[in-house]
A protein has these predicted regions:
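Accessory beta-strand-rich segments of carbohydrate-active enzymes
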Residues: 8, 12, 18-20, 27-33, ...
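Predominantly extracellular/luminal regions of secreted and cell-surface proteins
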Residues: 25-56
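A generic, residue-level signal for flexible/boundary positions that often mark functional hotspots
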Residues: 49-51, 64, 75
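Surface-exposed, low-complexity/disordered Ser/Thr/Gly/Pro/Asn-rich loops and linkers
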Residues: 55, 63-69
Length: 170
């Protein structure tokens, strides 16, 4: 079995497709939910925004503030993927997907400034199809995550709290 495949995920599609974990070198920015009127544009590059700082996944933005583990807030994660990692070819029949093992709580995924998908709640994995939004060269993924409490009886965390995989399906 290839080393890139997590031992806890013995699903057939991991063996039939090309998968690559993309947990490193994300950029992150958090703001209170009350400031949603000033949220980022899905086309805004985080590299030029001083509010962003580098993080690796998995990431929980609530855990750093032990005084307020139920802070209503939203986070923005951005990753630019080079053509070395995602060699998109428009003439190919290959399909590209992002597989999220877990994002808490509600999230929307943008690819190159266009909404590619969304997922509500956070205790299940999901996939987002990238192919219709990809371009040759670098591609930018932006994940907007909203956390609003109360939503559970225990600490649930907030953010992309599990691995993210880039998946190529022939």
């Amino acid at each position: 079995m290839p080393a890139e495949i997590p031992t806890g995920h013995r699903k057939a599609w991991f063996f039939m497709n090309t998968c690559r974990r993309i947990n490193s070198e994300w950029l992150f920015f958090k703001q209170p939910l009350s400031e949603t009127a000033t949220t980022l544009s899905p086309t805004l590059p985080a590299q030029n925004d001083s509010r962003f700082h580098p993080v690796n996944l998995p990431h929980d933005w609530l855990i750093a503030n032990s005084a307020d583990h139920y802070e209503n807030s939203e986070g923005w994660y951005q990753k630019t993927i080079s053509s070395d990692i995602l060699p998109f070819d428009a003439s190919s029949d290959d399909d590209w997907l992002l597989y999220f093992e877990g994002v808490y709580m509600d999230c929307t995924i943008f690819v190159n400034g266009m909404q590619a998908g969304e997922w509500k709640y956070g205790y299940s994995s999901f996939e987002v199809r990238l192919t219709p939004f990809l371009k040759t060269g670098e591609n930018t993924i932006l994940v907007h995550v909203r956390y609003q409490s109360p939503n559970s009886r225990w600490y649930s965390g907030a953010g992309i709290y599990r691995s993210v995989w880039l998946k190529k399906v022939p």
